[in-house]
Structure formats: structure tokens, C-alpha cells
């Protein structure tokens, strides 16, 4: 049986899904391109809604148009969908990166520099580090975004480093941000591979590529987002690491103008990952996170 893998049609999406297809061997699989609302609507993601890139893929999966769907985990709604079984394969680099003119870093950009990004989490952290630069809304694929720098329209853009490396352009980053200074989105760099919950063969296939450490870290990060009742476009950042059975979770909520940052870090045994995320969320709220999120 050949499994059909539903994917968006962009270079990044088909590259990511191609890696999943290859990793599934000896299970036979092929890619099926699915057009999503987010691919045809260039309005800011925070305006057109959570799930804009994932809803069409999930509908195709639910109705049998494909057997497996591959998403960027950070794009999925934070509530689990009982119709599907989800696994996280080995995680790519979770950091954000800058692609700037003349090889510049964020610190080296001149006052008033134009930086392309539409993500509130990125805007808020850029403004916290460099309140004197301007952030410009930006949508489109990697080539489109980076082309704005090459053409001189923008001084820099901020992208997920994982996406850049997946399409073989990681060496074009002029700065890869230290997560101590610039926390990633919950589950950034992680893929979510789904199949129908009642499809035993597809479940067996995708379970073979599950990375338990990547899954527990990414899921824990997303619990913070869920408990804050914030969508994937909110100015919320989180990252978890697992060492010798201890899970360390760092999360932050940042005002859009960078004027206020609420950040906390806690650790707990990995078996208590959900409780850890909930405790950290309560600490963020106690420190004023809810006020920032409105």
C-alpha cells in the first residue's frame, strides 16, 4: 500500500514532507499537494486566523484525500483534534535568524532600518532589543522574503532558521539568534505528522519516525500557549530542553513595542511536563502576562 502524504505546495513544505516520506521507508509513500487558504490569501496571518495553513490539510486527511498530513507544528491550533493521531519526528534547529544586507547583525543595523516580519513574537523581541528600528509586515515564501533584502526594499528579514536550512540556504543567515536573547515560537523547528486516529496502518508508519524527546519538548511548549489562551500568532515565546530526565522550560510574553518582557524558567521531571507548563503559565500571569496579551 502506498501512503499519500498531504502537503502544502511551497518549496519548504514539499522539502519537509519529502524528508518525512524518505524517513518512512520501508513504508511506501508519495506526496499529494493541497492548496490551503493561507497560500492564496496574503493578508497578515493574525488577521486571517489560526489554522490558516492547516485546516485544508486536515480536511483532506479527514475525508480520505490523503493518509498522512505534514504541518509545521507551530501552525496548528493548540487544542488537540481527536480525529487525528499526531507524532513529532526529529526536530530541526529551533532558533530564529536574521538575513540582512551587507552581512550585518541586528546590533549593527542603523537606526531606522526596515526589518521584515509579520509575527508579533518576532516584532516584540526585535523592538525589545532595538527600539530604534522599524518592523514591516511580510508574507510569502522564503525566496519572496529574502528577495526584499536583495532588492534593497528592506534592510533585513527574520525567518525560522530551520526553514532556511531545510531548503539548503542556511549559510545565507547573517545572524542566528541566541535563544537567551530571542526565544523561539512554541514548537518552532518541529514538524507535526498526522494520520486518522482509526487508520492502524498509517499510525504504525508514522509511529516509526516519532522522536519522543522532540515530541515532549514541543508539546510542553504548546501547553503554555494553550493555557495562556493565546493563538499561534500571539507575542508568546517558549522553549523546552530535556537532559537526564529533567525538563527545563523557558517562556516569555513580550509587549508588541518591546517595552515590557515577562519571562520565567522552571524545571521538573519529564513525566510532569504538563504540570510544569501550567505552573510556569501561572507564574507568567502573576507577573503581568495577561495584561500584555489584553
Curated annotation (Swiss-Prot):
Keywords: Porphyrin biosynthesis, Transferase. It is an enzyme of class 2 (transferase). It catalyses: 4 porphobilinogen + H2O = hydroxymethylbilane + 4 NH4(+). GO terms for cellular component: cytoplasm. GO terms for biological process: protoporphyrinogen IX biosynthetic process. This is Porphobilinogen deaminase. Monomer. Belongs to the HMBS family. Disulfide bonds: none annotated. It comes from the Bacteria. Binds 1 dipyrromethane group covalently. Gene3D superfamilies: Periplasmic binding protein-like II, Porphobilinogen deaminase, C-terminal domain. The modification S-(dipyrrolylmethanemethyl)cysteine is found at residue 232. The keyword Transferase applies. Pathway: Porphyrin-containing compound metabolism; protoporphyrin-IX biosynthesis; coproporphyrinogen-III from 5-aminolevulinate: step 2/4. The porphobilinogen subunits are added to the dipyrromethane group.
Amino acid at each position: 500500500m502506498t501512503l499519500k502524504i498531504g502537503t502544502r505546495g511551497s518549496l519548504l513544505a514539499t522539502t519537509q514532507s519529502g524528508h518525512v516520506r524518505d524517513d518512512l521507508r520501508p513504508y511506501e509513500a508519495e506526496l499529494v499537494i493541497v492548496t490551503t487558504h493561507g497560500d492564496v490569501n496574503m493578508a497578515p496571518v493574525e488577521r486571517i486566523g489560526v489554522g490558516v495553513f492547516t485546516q485544508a490539510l486536515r480536511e483532506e486527511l479527514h475525508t480520505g484525500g490523503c493518509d498522512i498530513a505534514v504541518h509545521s507544528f507551530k501552525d496548528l491550533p493548540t487544542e488537540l483534534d481527536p480525529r487525528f493521531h499526531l507524532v513529532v519526528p526529529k526536530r530541526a534547529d529551533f532558533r530564529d535568524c536574521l538575513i540582512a544586507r551587507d552581512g550585518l547583525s541586528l546590533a549593527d543595523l542603523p537606526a531606522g532600518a526596515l526589518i521584515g516580519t509579520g509575527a508579533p513574537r518576532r516584532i516584540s523581541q526585535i523592538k525589545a532589543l532595538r527600539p530604534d528600528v522599524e518592523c514591516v509586515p511580510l508574507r510569502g515564501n522564503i525566496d519572496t522574503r529574502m528577495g526584499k533584502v536583495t532588492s534593497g526594499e528592506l534592510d533585513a528579514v527574520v525567518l525560522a532558521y530551520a526553514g532556511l536550512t531545510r531548503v539548503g540556504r542556511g549559510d545565507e543567515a547573517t545572524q542566528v539568534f541566541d535563544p537567551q536573547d530571542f526565544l523561539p515560537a512554541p514548537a518552532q523547528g518541529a514538524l507535526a505528522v498526522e494520520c486518522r486516529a482509526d487508520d492502524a496502518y498509517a499510525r504504525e508508519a508514522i509511529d516509526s519516525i516519532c522522536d519522543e524527546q522532540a515530541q515532549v519538548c514541543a508539546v510542553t511548549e504548546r501547553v503554555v500557549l494553550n493555557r495562556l489562551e493565546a493563538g499561534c500568532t500571539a507575542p508568546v515565546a517558549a522553549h523546552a530542553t530535556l537532559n537526564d530526565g529533567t525538563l527545563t522550560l523557558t517562556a516569555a510574553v513580550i509587549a508588541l513595542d518591546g517595552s515590557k518582557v515577562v519571562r520565567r524558567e522552571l524545571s521538573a521531571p519529564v513525566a510532569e511536563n504538563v504540570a510544569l507548563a501550567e505552573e510556569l503559565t501561572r507564574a507568567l500571569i502573576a507577573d503581568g502576562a495577561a495584561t500584555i496579551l489584553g
